């Protein structure tokens, strides 16, 4: 099995390197990741300039583009063989609920999915991670399971892992996305030269975090696994919109 690894934290990120070390024991891996931190890049593609690809001393490819660029480039032109799987991560911080809209980690997996490759995004439940090994060990077990019994395509799974030692994990749970409160306001400040600048505010706290959500699962030290889809259609409102337009 050949696995394409990517992320949004950059090719040098500890989570990606630990994941690569573990998965190399059970599969052939190739890493194509951004040259710098591209957290929050979502599904953006670079269309206004060419992309450059370089190879680090450890064999990882790094690209001056977004996470989506990396996977798109790898699958459609860079690699001699198509990967059997795309794994994005391990992200330093959660990608739960509304996070999935902004996440470059999830976006990299989504691009693999759109290109017909079974894809997985894996993130830790908080920033400042201490236990990347926990997620890496779980992903090894998931890959082994997939090698033995392949899940029918299409596959796009968003995985969030509690930041605890592996022996404290209380199993897995198939979940739905929760929801956060709206983000904190932007932070306004002034540079030493008197220029006004703004920082994007922090993500909101969990709002919908009840039973069955990704937020609830990780709070109970369970690994959250949420199947995702691309279709954003709000089916329940189609008739309502038709009636509104007919007025």
UniProtKB/Swiss-Prot annotation:
<keyword id="KW-0547">Nucleotide-binding</keyword>
<keyword id="KW-0378">Hydrolase</keyword>
<dbReference type="Pfam" id="PF01975">
    <property type="entry name" value="SurE"/>
</dbReference>
<dbReference type="GO" id="GO:0005737">
    <property type="term" value="C:cytoplasm"/>
</dbReference>
<feature type="binding site">
    <location>
        <position position="39"/>
    </location>
    <ligand>
        <name>a divalent metal cation</name>
    </ligand>
</feature>
<protein>
    <recommendedName>
        <fullName>5'-nucleotidase SurE</fullName>
        <ecNumber>3.1.3.5</ecNumber>
    </recommendedName>
</protein>
<keyword id="KW-0963">Cytoplasm</keyword>
<dbReference type="GO" id="GO:0000166">
    <property type="term" value="F:nucleotide binding"/>
</dbReference>
<feature type="binding site">
    <location>
        <position position="91"/>
    </location>
    <ligand>
        <name>a divalent metal cation</name>
    </ligand>
</feature>
<dbReference type="GO" id="GO:0046872">
    <property type="term" value="F:metal ion binding"/>
</dbReference>
<comment type="function">
    <text>Nucleotidase that shows phosphatase activity on nucleoside 5'-monophosphates.</text>
</comment>
<dbReference type="GO" id="GO:0004309">
    <property type="term" value="F:exopolyphosphatase activity"/>
</dbReference>
<dbReference type="InterPro" id="IPR030048">
    <property type="entry name" value="SurE"/>
</dbReference>
<feature type="binding site">
    <location>
        <position position="9"/>
    </location>
    <ligand>
        <name>a divalent metal cation</name>
    </ligand>
</feature>
<keyword id="KW-0479">Metal-binding</keyword>
<dbReference type="InterPro" id="IPR036523">
    <property type="entry name" value="SurE-like_sf"/>
</dbReference>
<comment type="similarity">
    <text>Belongs to the SurE nucleotidase family.</text>
</comment>
<dbReference type="InterPro" id="IPR002828">
    <property type="entry name" value="SurE-like_Pase/nucleotidase"/>
</dbReference>
<feature type="binding site">
    <location>
        <position position="8"/>
    </location>
    <ligand>
        <name>a divalent metal cation</name>
    </ligand>
</feature>
<dbReference type="GO" id="GO:0008254">
    <property type="term" value="F:3'-nucleotidase activity"/>
</dbReference>
<dbReference type="GO" id="GO:0008253">
    <property type="term" value="F:5'-nucleotidase activity"/>
</dbReference>
